[in-house]
Regions:
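Conserved redox-cofactor binding core of oxidoreductases
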Residues: 2-133
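Glycine-rich loop(s) and the adjacent beta-strand/alpha-helix scaffold that form part
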Residues: 122, 135-142, 148-210
Length: 210
């Protein structure tokens, strides 16, 4: 949008740069949907699409006829597998409306159903519970993050974990809070805050909040 409309700062990469990574994630997670060839909605690595119900099919047909095929009503694309993934011990969607409660069949993609089991299967996963990360440790000499400081919520003791790579995956607000709480004399506004934007213009996805 930035390049086409000539506004703001353009991205340094394009969709084609990200496409292989999108494909990798889509195949791993399992995305059902239909390939429509729409420029505004790029196709993905889809599993067979869920079917529209009778009413939806009727509405879709009328929309297509009314707009001479220029507008489409399609099934929503979602991370519900419609074909079993035995390598992940996941079975296809059972249409039980239990997605939001943590699908017991593993059909709806989640950390519990897919990524944690895959990580555990490598033999390189150590899962720590009751640990609250309070700070990312920044090594001034190496000029990189080298670990995290955590508080054990049960013992009320502080521990330090080191790693070659640190991933910050605590959602919008907690990730921002953690980076700000990791401020140093090099990064007084928070770790990585070179633009002054950290802590500002934060966006999050709220679900059913009045």
């Amino acid at each position: 949008a930035n390049a086409k409309e000539g506004i703001a700062v353009d991205w340094p990469i394009r969709y084609d740069d990200l496409a292989p990574w999108y494909s990798y994630v889509e195949k791993f997670a399992g995305i059902q949907g239909s390939k429509e060839g729409l420029e505004v909605l790029p196709d993905s690595e889809f599993l067979p699409a869920m079917d529209l119900n009778v009413v939806e099919k009727e509405v879709a047909a009328k929309i297509k006829t009314h707009y001479n095929g220029k507008r489409h009503m399609i099934i929503g694309r979602s991370a519900n597998i419609t074909q079993a993934k035995p390598e992940q011990n996941r079975v296809s969607c059972q249409y039980r409306n239990r997605c939001w409660r943590g699908c017991p069949f593993g059909a709806y993609f989640s950390t519990q159903s897919a990524t944690l089991p895959a990580a555990n299967a490598t033999g390189n996963l150590t899962l720590e519970t009751d640990k609250i990360v309070t700070k990312i440790i920044f090594d001034k000499d190496k000029k990189k993050a080298t670990g995290v400081e955590v508080i054990d919520a049960v013992e009320n003791k502080t521990y330090t974990y080191t790693a070659k790579i640190i991933f910050v995956c605590a959602s919008s607000f907690n990730s921002t809070w953690l980076l700000m709480n990791s401020a140093t004399d090099i990064w007084p506004g928070g770790l990585g805050s070179s633009s002054g934007e950290l802590g500002n213009n934060v966006m999050d996805h709220h679900f059913r909040i009045g």
